[in-house]
Structure formats: structure tokens, C-alpha cells
């Protein structure tokens, strides 16, 4: 019975057959079957890392590099990287090989790595990042979208900023991240832009907000669309216009947010007598 239990624990991650072993990198490291090092290729997203693994055994090994592994910069000034695509690496006895790895920065406040920066790799990320990595392992989006999704969890950035030009493509990922974070699916889309300075620091700037604002208007009114901060202070008047009487209508929004600071706001449709609609959003 004891032997059966031990064998069951190893199924799926480790097996031996005709002196060929397939084993997860984590188990191979724990059992000292391999030694491994990770290095940056000089970027913080996409195929930006390389892992070098040496087989220390007399058998051939097939190493599974798991999605969800967190590569930790040995210099705390630089970003950690989350692996989002699993890879298999075959090694003959005593052989050493390198393999490129797809991953994303999961520490937005730190600097982007330079080429050759060494990373530690004997650690899986937290549960939420592992869930996201496993999702990205089998679902593909553009690099900016995937990077934004990682930051939405690792750095608690706004889930609404997970977008693509064809937003129907990004919607499932936005829904997935909202589920992981246990928050409502955002009613709006926040378009942003990243800028990396020569120091390696990365800043993120808001571009615009898109969505639909539901309202009801009992009679013809002159209405104004405004943005209010979390202290109730007007921070932007978008436009004023005549609004026909209508019930349960929708106003299409495409609002510039250039120059707005990060924080919580509401977008409101008002007349000189009352508020017709209000929606909260965050940058």
C-alpha cells in the first residue's frame, strides 16, 4: 500500500521508462538531478529569457519547464519574470542545453532587465499568477495584452486595461482576470500606453475610456458629460449637447484621458436640474 501511494504521487510529473525520465523542473531541482540557471535576453515580455539546464544523471531526461514558474532577479532592482508557456527540453546523460522561454514582467515598479542578467528559478509564483499562466499557456493574445493581464494580477493594475484592437479577442482574458481577482467584469475599456525609460523603469499612461453609459431622459434636455474625481470635484467637462427624450438609452463613450492621474473617478451625464447617469471607473 505504501508503495502504491508513493507511485501515485509521482504520476503526471515524473516517470521512468527504459532509462528515460520525464520530470518537472521543480522536482528535478529538488532531487538534484539537474542544475539550472536563467538569464535575461534584455526584454521584459515575450521570448525574453533563456534557461540553461545540465543533466547530472546517467540517464536521459525530458525536463518539463512549467508555466507559472517565477524567475527571480538576483538583483532586487530588476523585474521578476513569470513563465507563461511550458516547454519540454530533452537531455542526454551529462548534457547541457539552453532554451528560450516566453514570460512577462510581474513586478512593474522595478526596472526592465538587461541582457545577461541572472535569475533564480527554484520557485513557483503565487496561486493567482499560476492560474493566469496556465490560461495563457493554451490561449494566445498579443504581447501587450498578455503583459497587461499579468500586471493586472501581480501589480493590481486595472483589469479594464486588458484590451486589443478587436476587443472581442481580449474579452475572454479580461473576464478570466476579473474572475481570478474576484471582481466584477469592467463595464468599460481603458486604453493605455507603456513607456520604458533608458533607466529601465516603465511608466503606464491612460489614453482613453470606451464603453456605454445607460441613461433615461424624460424630455428634451441640454446635457453635459463630465468626469468627477473620488472627492466629488469636476476634473473634466467632455461635451455639452441637446439630448432627446428617451428611456433606457445608451450613450457611446470614447473619452480622452490624457493627462489624468491614476485614481478613481466617475463619468456623469447631467442637466442643470438632475443627474441622468453615472458610472465609476478607475485609471
Residue positions per predicted region:
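Short acidic, flexible loop segments centered on an aromatic residue
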Residues: 59-78, 224-231
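Edge beta-strands of extracellular beta-sandwich domains
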Residues: 275-283
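Intrinsically disordered, low-complexity Pro/Gly/Ser/Thr-rich segments with frequent PxxP/GP/PP motifs
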Residues: 72-120, 233-252
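Low-complexity, acidic Ser/Thr/Pro/Gly-rich terminal tails and inter-domain linkers that flank the onset
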Residues: 19-42, 184-200
Amino acid at each position: 500500500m505504501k508503495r502504491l501511494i508513493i507511485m501515485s504521487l509521482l504520476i503526471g510529473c515524473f516517470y521512468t521508462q527504459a532509462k528515460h525520465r520525464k520530470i518537472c523542473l521543480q522536482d528535478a531541482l529538488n532531487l538534484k538531478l539537474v542544475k539550472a540557471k536563467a538569464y535575461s535576453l534584455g526584454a521584459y515580455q515575450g521570448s525574453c529569457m533563456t534557461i540553461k539546464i545540465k543533466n547530472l544523471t546517467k540517464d536521459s531526461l525530458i525536463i518539463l519547464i512549467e508555466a507559472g514558474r517565477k524567475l527571480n532577479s538576483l538583483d532586487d532592482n530588476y523585474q521578476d519574470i513569470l513563465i507563461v508557456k511550458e516547454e519540454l527540453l530533452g537531455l542526454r546523460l551529462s548534457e547541457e542545453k539552453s532554451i528560450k522561454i516566453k514570460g512577462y514582467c510581474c513586478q512593474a515598479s522595478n526596472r526592465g532587465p538587461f541582457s545577461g542578467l541572472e535569475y533564480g528559478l527554484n520557485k513557483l509564483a503565487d496561486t493567482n499568477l499560476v492560474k493566469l499562466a496556465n490560461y495563457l499557456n493554451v490561449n494566445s493574445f498579443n504581447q501587450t495584452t498578455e503583459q497587461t493581464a499579468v500586471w493586472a494580477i501581480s501589480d493590481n493594475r486595472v483589469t479594464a486595461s486588458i484590451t486589443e484592437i478587436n476587443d472581442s479577442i481580449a474579452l475572454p482574458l479580461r473576464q478570466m482576470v476579473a474572475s481570478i481577482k474576484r471582481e466584477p467584469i469592467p463595464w468599460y475599456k481603458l486604453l493605455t500606453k507603456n513607456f520604458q525609460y533608458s533607466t529601465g523603469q516603465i511608466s503606464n499612461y491612460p489614453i482613453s475610456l470606451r464603453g456605454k453609459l445607460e441613461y433615461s431622459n424624460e424630455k428634451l434636455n441640454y446635457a453635459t458629460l463630465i468626469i468627477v474625481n473620488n472627492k466629488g470635484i469636476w476634473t473634466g467637462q467632455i461635451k455639452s449637447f441637446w439630448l432627446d427624450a428617451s428611456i433606457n438609452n445608451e450613450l457611446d463613450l470614447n473619452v480622452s484621458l490624457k493627462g489624468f492621474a491614476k485614481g478613481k473617478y466617475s463619468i456623469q451625464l447631467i442637466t442643470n436640474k438632475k443627474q441622468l447617469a453615472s458610472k465609476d471607473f478607475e485609471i
